[in-house]
């Protein structure tokens, strides 16, 4: 039994609140245990200069954490005048993952801005951001469809992410909270599509190594969790699912 009472291969309690914000074309508040992230999707009727005239769209992301999302207050990165390497890495990860399942040609020459703001952090903020951002993005695409600006919702598949790890006294566990993540021997983030294709796998031994057999076990656990997350995304999207499948 884990510190929060879960089984080893069990997700935290997940809730996806859709249309959480008034102004964005798509928005959600995703809760993964005590981790809470607001994800919004904004449609801009233009593309970056490097893509003009190509007839394709673009998806990009920004990620931030409010000062007291963590146990101790952290200084806003805007106060420092630059984003940290960690933030830049996460932003690129979110954008890259979403682009893997977006039909950029069907989107047309538009930019989708994804904003992920962590309001409470307890591990897995980047994976929660990806899972929530996908739903926010599809909600925004539904607005484009209703306005007859696109002929279909421009996504090719579902997308979700979770963490897995090896914690000494537990072995392989799914969806690590902060307490588990901080003492894990191996920490891994996995992003997959609804068809079971991998988009990204980030795995690191923390002063430890892991075997091929353990890697397979980690990926199996991640796959199980991600398919459950995708079912929750479908439930959150409701009737919009009929435009995707």
Curated annotation (Swiss-Prot):
GO biological process: rRNA catabolic process; rRNA processing; tRNA processing
Keywords, sorted A to Z: Nucleotidyltransferase, RNA-binding, rRNA processing, Transferase, tRNA processing, tRNA-binding
Catalytic activity: tRNA(n+1) + phosphate = tRNA(n) + a ribonucleoside 5'-diphosphate
Domain of life: Bacteria
GO molecular function per UniProt: 3'-5'-RNA exonuclease activity; tRNA binding; tRNA nucleotidyltransferase activity
Enzyme class label: transferase
Pfam families hit by this protein: RNase_PH (PF01138), RNase_PH_C (PF03725)
SUPFAM superfamilies in alphabetical order: Ribonuclease PH domain 2-like (SSF55666), Ribosomal protein S5 domain 2-like (SSF54211)
Annotated family: Belongs to the RNase PH family.
Subunit text: Homohexameric ring arranged as a trimer of dimers.
Function: Phosphorolytic 3'-5' exoribonuclease that plays an important role in tRNA 3'-end maturation. Removes nucleotide residues following the 3'-CCA terminus of tRNAs; can also add nucleotides to the ends of RNA molecules by using nucleoside diphosphates as substrates, but this may not be physiologically important. Probably plays a role in initiation of 16S rRNA degradation (leading to ribosome degradation) during starvation.
Protein name: Ribonuclease PH
Organism: Bacillus cereus (strain B4264)
Primary gene name: rph
């Amino acid at each position: 039994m884990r510190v929060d009472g879960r089984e080893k291969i069990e997700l935290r309690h997940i809730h996806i609140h859709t249309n959480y914000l008034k102004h964005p074309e798509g928005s959600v508040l995703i809760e993964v245990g005590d981790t809470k992230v607001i994800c919004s999707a904004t449609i801009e009727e233009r593309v970056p200069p490097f893509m003009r005239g190509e007839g394709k769209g673009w998806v990009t992301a920004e990620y931030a954490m409010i000062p007291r999302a963590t146990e101790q207050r952290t200084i806003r990165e805007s106060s420092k005048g630059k984003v940290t390497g960690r933030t830049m890495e996460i932003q690129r990860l979110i954008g890259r993952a979403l682009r893997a399942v977006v039909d950029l040609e069907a989107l047309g020459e538009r930019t989708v801005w994804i904003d992920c703001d962590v309001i409470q952090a307890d591990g897995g903020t980047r994976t929660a951001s990806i899972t929530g951002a996908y739903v926010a993005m599809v909600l925004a695409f539904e607005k484009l469809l209703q306005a007859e600006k696109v002929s279909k919702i421009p996504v090719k598949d579902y997308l979700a992410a979770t963490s897995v790890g090896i914690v000494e006294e537990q072995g392989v566990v799914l969806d690590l909270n902060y307490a588990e993540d901080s003492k894990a021997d191996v920490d891994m983030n996995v992003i997959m599509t609804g068809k079971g294709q991998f988009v990204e796998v980030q795995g690191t031994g923390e002063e430890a190594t892991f075997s091929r057999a353990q890697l397979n076990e980690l990926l199996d656990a991640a796959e199980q969790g991600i398919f459950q997350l995708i079912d929750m995304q479908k439930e959150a999207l409701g009737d919009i699912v009929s435009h995707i499948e």
